[in-house]
Amino acid sequence: MAKATTIKEALSRWEEKTGQKPSDAREIKLYAQIPPIEKMDASLSTLANCEKLSLSTNCIEKIANLNGLKNLRILSLGRNNIKNLNGLEAVGDTLEELWISYNFIEKLKGIHVMRKLKILYISNNLVKDWAEFVKLAELPCLEDLVFVGNPLEEKHSAEGNWIEEATKRVPKLKKLDGTPVIKEDEEEES
């Protein structure tokens, strides 16, 4: 089997392709590397100016080494093998969007550190309990959530009460699974 691509190798390919220095760049795309990236290694800490980092469609198992990314606002980790949200604390004060759909996340422990998070795409993961879902209510800025394809959503959508139950538990949401949320008091006023 081919050896995994390291972040360092992916960055040097990216630099060759774009002609930009990774340490200066605001947006870096390292998605779908062949062979795939398996580890978020220490080379990431050189990306001091990066605001948007895409590592989607690789084989990453753990979120790590984000401490040098002082300006990171958008992190794309969709279609990897990530099982939990540990490692996000390093970007808890800056991250506004986390795209982490199509992984193996069951528990949302550690999400509370994301104090600026506005957008969370966490569809097609393994979250099955309300006890995990309610942790999203701890995010003071969260307004757009895509949660479709998690066992919890599938069960309640089949019962016809998903949007009602989800927005009751995370009342600040403005958009759920791509649909604008209309609050009952807004309905009564119209």
UniProtKB/Swiss-Prot annotation:
Stored InterPro entries: Leu-rich_rpt, Leu-rich_rpt_4, LRR_dom_sf
Modified residues (N-acetylalanine): A2
One GO biological process term: outer dynein arm assembly
Cellular component aspect of the GO annotation: cell projection; cytoplasm; dynein complex; microtubule
SUPFAM superfamilies per the UniProt record, alphabetical: L domain-like
Entry function: Part of the multisubunit axonemal ATPase complexes that generate the force for cilia motility and govern beat frequency. Component of the outer arm dynein (ODA). May be involved in a mechanosensory feedback mechanism controlling ODA activity based on external conformational cues by tethering the outer arm dynein heavy chain (DNAH5) to the microtubule within the axoneme. Important for ciliary function in the airways and for the function of the cilia that produce the nodal flow essential for the determination of the left-right asymmetry.
Other comments on record: Outer (ODAs) and inner (IDAs) dynein arms contain the molecular motors that generate the force to move cilia by ATP-dependent reactions. There are two mechanosensory systems that monitor and respond to the mechanical state (curvature) of the axoneme. One system involves the central pair microtubule complex and radial spokes and the second system involves the outer dynein arms.
Protein name: Dynein axonemal light chain 1
Designated gene of the protein: Dnal1
